[in-house]
């Protein structure tokens, strides 16, 4: 393709102010995307080529394991989501689904995911075990009503995703296929030139028995990955479990009440009273809002040197109640005032807080749901709030079980913790960008949407189901996070918009012009994905743009063209070959094969 006639570059000289991370900056500056509105982007021709190459890699790999491509509607009737009991969770409060009504007043949602639609279709077309297993996938635009879109294509309102759904006759068959898809994902990401790590993950709103995320390690990642150096364990922070460090025992001479004026935080209490955070139990108040029932107040207790994992807490509370949990909110002073709770000792609460403290609350259950983390429940002597403003006290041999506490894992695992499968290994931490997620859904959706099949004995059974997502546009941006330098993008050759760019330095020179056309046409004939920068701009402008857009190889046609010589440059390592034009194609093919093989 030629820049002047079919492939305008649209590069920028200045870095857009709204771009926070390097990959977002480079996508905008190099002209790959254009911002239309917050979280909404146009994919320019050069970006579309990247997306198409990523999509092709995905299709080849998924087709090889027996998956079939289709295309599902983006507009979903609300009744399907109400059958699965996800409508309220996805549209109310902080729900992420854009929703609307048609002129007849019927409700619809713009799809962030397609479990309901595909399960409904499966219930109509699959009726026998002889038709199983089946796996369908699509690559198309998804929508999320993000509260705060940021980081370009990482967290946008509209994005391109591959989502797949498999149906099985047994849990065993589902588990086997789940592993097969996991292996295919590893091949896909490797073929895209990415370094990834697979981690145990929380299933979130999609649900299911187990799930695994695939992360690109990058400093700009929003997710924290905890892992061992040996590779024996890896999980995201929402899911990770570990053995915490041992607490420092409280001295025998410390007892009774401790005056702690205006000392509401663990840090303040420790600093003013010569204590260690591991000697304190902090009590955090949450309010759980459900789809159908009054709000439930939660007392969550954890050791002072640990942090509550709100995802684990959310999942636990959701399991305890029959109604769907919509959201979990930490209670601050303002909420206490709104609920007419006078003299509520927020900041000085202890684990023995009485139910009487919430009797006057409106719309709340009148009994605390009490939960304590394992690490805190084993403390025989500790300090906590005295349920009186400006006071803490020492607790000794406090019985959490007699106070109806559930003892559960609600803490964040962290760097330096030992792992449960081998207490000789410590957790390390790094940041990651999620680009893929696979789930074993079990029968969650088939039960609710009545998707059944007849087994070999003629009995009707619910289908077993898995789902598998890849963020296509996320892969593109994550690849830039892992592959850039101070000059611009350094694309892995497999997903680069072009393999090579030809840059004539002076098109007014007839020798250069003729040699440029000869090389360009020769590369086209040999099916090389080539871009010709045939602009009349200065050579320096062309060089700068070529480095910015990041095409793996550059062919410079300059003054040496009079001797039929050109320069071949590798973008990633700046290796340069000054060679005769008739050896150029052979040299390029050899060097590009090395690059392809490096990432295969």
Swiss-Prot record:
Function: Catalyzes the attachment of proline to tRNA(Pro) in a two-step reaction: proline is first activated by ATP to form Pro-AMP and then transferred to the acceptor end of tRNA(Pro). As ProRS can inadvertently accommodate and process non-cognate amino acids such as alanine and cysteine, to avoid such errors it has two additional distinct editing activities against alanine. One activity is designated as 'pretransfer' editing and involves the tRNA(Pro)-independent hydrolysis of activated Ala-AMP.
Keyword Ligase attributed: yes
Lineage top rank: taxon: Bacteria
GO BP, sorted A to Z: prolyl-tRNA aminoacylation
Compartments, record wording: Cytoplasm
Location, primary (coarse class): cytoplasm
Keyword Transferase in record: no
Keywords: Aminoacyl-tRNA synthetase, ATP-binding, Cytoplasm, Ligase, Nucleotide-binding, Protein biosynthesis
The protein's enzyme class: ligase
The protein's assembly and partners: Homodimer.
Protein name: Proline--tRNA ligase
This protein's domain notes: Consists of three domains: the N-terminal catalytic domain, the editing domain and the C-terminal anticodon-binding domain.
Gene Ontology molecular function terms on file: aminoacyl-tRNA deacylase activity; ATP binding; proline-tRNA ligase activity
Family listed: Belongs to the class-II aminoacyl-tRNA synthetase family. ProS type 1 subfamily.
Catalytic activity from the UniProt record: tRNA(Pro) + L-proline + ATP = L-prolyl-tRNA(Pro) + AMP + diphosphate
Source organism of this protein record: Prochlorococcus marinus (strain MIT 9312)
Alphabetical list of InterPro entries matching this protein: aa-tRNA-synt_IIb (IPR002314), aa-tRNA-synth_II (IPR006195), aa-tRNA-synth_II/BPL/LPL (IPR045864), Anticodon-bd (IPR004154), Anticodon-bd_dom_sf (IPR036621), Pro-tRNA-ligase_IIa (IPR002316), Pro-tRNA-synth_IIa_bac-type (IPR004500), Pro-tRNA-Synthase_IIa_type1 (IPR023717)
């Amino acid at each position: 393709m030629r820049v002047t006639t079919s492939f305008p570059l649209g590069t920028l000289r200045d870095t857009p102010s709204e771009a926070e991370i390097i990959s977002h900056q480079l996508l905008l500056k190099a002209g790959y995307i254009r911002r239309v509105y917050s979280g909404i982007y146009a994919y320019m021709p050069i970006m579309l080529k990247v997306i198409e190459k990523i999509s092709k890699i995905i299709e080849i790999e998924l087709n090889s394991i027996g998956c079939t491509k289709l295309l599902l509607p983006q507009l979903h009737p609300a009744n399907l989501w109400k059958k699965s009991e996800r409508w309220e969770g996805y549209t109310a409060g902080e729900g992420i689904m854009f929703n609307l009504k048609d002129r007849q007043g019927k409700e619809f949602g713009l799809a962030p995911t397609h479990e309901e639609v595909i399960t409904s279709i499966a219930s109509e077309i699959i009726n026998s075990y002889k038709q199983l297993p089946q796996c369908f996938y699509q690559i198309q635009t998804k929508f999320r009503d993000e509260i705060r879109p940021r980081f370009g294509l990482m967290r946008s309102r509209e994005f391109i995703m591959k989502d797949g759904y498999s149906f099985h006759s047994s849990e065993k068959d589902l588990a086997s296929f789940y592993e097969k898809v996991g292996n295919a994902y590893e091949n896909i990401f490797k073929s895209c030139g990415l370094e990834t790590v697979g981690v145990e993950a929380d299933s979130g709103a999609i649900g299911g028995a187990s799930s695994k995320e695939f992360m690109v390690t990058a400093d700009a990642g929003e997710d924290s990955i905890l892992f061992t150096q040996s590779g024996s364990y890896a999980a995201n922070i929402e899911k990770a479990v570990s053995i915490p460090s041992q607490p420092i025992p409280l001295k025998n001479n410390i007892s009774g009440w401790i005056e702690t004026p205006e000392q509401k935080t663990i840090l303040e209490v420790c600093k003013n009273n010569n204590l260690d955070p591991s000697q304190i139990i902090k009590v955090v108040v949450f309010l759980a809002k459900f789809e159908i029932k009054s709000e439930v107040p939660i007392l969550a207790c954890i050791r002072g040197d640990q942090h509550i994992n709100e995802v684990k807490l959310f999942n636990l509370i959701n399991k305890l109640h029959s109604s769907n949990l919509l959201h979990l909110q930490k209670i601050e002073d303002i909420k206490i005032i709104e609920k007419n709770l006078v003299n509520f000792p927020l900041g000085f609460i202890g684990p023995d807080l009485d139910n009487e403290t919430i009797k006057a609350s409106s719309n709340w259950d009148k009994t605390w749901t009490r939960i304590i983390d394992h690490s805190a429940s084993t403390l025989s002597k500790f300090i906590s709030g005295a349920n009186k403003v400006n006071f803490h006290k020492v607790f000794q041999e406090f019985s959490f079980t007699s106070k109806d506490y559930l003892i559960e894992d609600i803490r964040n695992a962290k760097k330096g913790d030992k792992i449960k499968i081998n207490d000789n290994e410590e957790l390390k931490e790094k940041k990651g960008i999620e680009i893929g997620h696979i789930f074993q859904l079990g029968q969650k959706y088939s039960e609710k949407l009545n998707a059944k099949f007849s087994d070999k004995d003629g009995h009707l059974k619910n289908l077993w189901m898995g789902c598998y997502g890849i963020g296509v546009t996320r892969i593109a941006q994550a690849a830039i996070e892992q592959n850039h330098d101070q000059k611009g993008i350094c694309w892995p050759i497999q997903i680069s918009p072009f393999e090579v760019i030809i840059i004539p330095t002076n098109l007014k020179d007839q020798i250069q012009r003729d040699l440029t056309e000869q090389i360009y046409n020769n590369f086209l004939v040999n099916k090389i994905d080539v871009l010709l920068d045939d602009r009349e701009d200065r050579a320096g402008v062309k060089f700068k743009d070529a480095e910015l857009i990041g095409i793996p190889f550059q062919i410079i046609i300059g003054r040496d063209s009079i001797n039929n010589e050109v320069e071949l440059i590798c973008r990633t390592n700046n290796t340069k070959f000054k060679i005769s034009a008739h050896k150029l194609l052979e040299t390029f093919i050899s060097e590009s094969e090395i690059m392809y093989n490096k990432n295969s």
